[in-house]
């Protein structure tokens, strides 16, 4: 298996346990550049994107480029290799939803020029481009909208609610609640 990763905000030690595995090949690559992987490919998993608000607010143009050029490059690679591709999207495509819970036919309420707009729009464009490749080229695609991931090796200063709460608890601080505290979230442990 080959993996093409751009390591913005990722620590290599988090995947060091995979390096000795015979079936694992690691490629360090910027997906916004042309992607070539030698040999046959069955699947491409496109998870490249900053997901932390701390990161995507620092690198807004790169975030948009990964969602557009990076996705285009990986869809092109999938087409060239006759590979299936899974695109990791996000609940952020819904923006600040007016409907709870959101169904897949809900289009969302996104502020395209707001602070989160770069991430939200990168993912919305990524989904549209993926569907265009599917409909126009017949590429076998899947899109998964992942909600609020959390798990081991997550940075406590990530900018998302679970690491923020964990960091505050570990420091013996009160947990910061925004608004009236009645917000709901769906979480995905990874």
Language-model features: where?
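Glycine/proline-rich active-site loop of Rossmann-fold NAD(P)-dependent oxidoreductases
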Residues: 124, 139-140, 149-164, 171-173, ...
């Amino acid at each position: 298996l080959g993996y093409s990763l751009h390591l913005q905000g990722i620590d290599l030690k988090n995947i060091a346990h995979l390096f000795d595995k015979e079936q694992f090949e690691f490629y360090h690559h910027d997906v916004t550049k042309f992607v070539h992987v030698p040999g046959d490919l069955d699947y491409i998993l496109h998870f490249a994107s900053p997901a932390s608000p701390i990161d995507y607010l620092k690198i807004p143009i790169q975030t948009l480029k990964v969602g557009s050029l990076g996705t285009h490059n990986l869809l092109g690679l999938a087409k060239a290799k006759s590979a299936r591709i899974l695109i990791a999207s996000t609940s952020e495509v819904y923006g600040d939803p007016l409907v709870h819970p959101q169904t897949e036919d809900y289009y969302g309420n996104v502020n395209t020029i707001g602070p989160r707009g770069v991430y939200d729009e990168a993912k919305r464009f990524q989904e549209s481009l993926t569907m265009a490749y599917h409909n126009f080229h017949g590429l076998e695609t899947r899109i998964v909208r992942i909600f609020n991931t959390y798990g081991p090796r997550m940075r406590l200063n990530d900018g998302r609610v679970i690491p923020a709460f964990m960091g505050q608890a570990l420091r013996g601080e009160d947990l910061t609640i925004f608004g009236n505290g009645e917000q709901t979230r769906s979480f995905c442990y990874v």
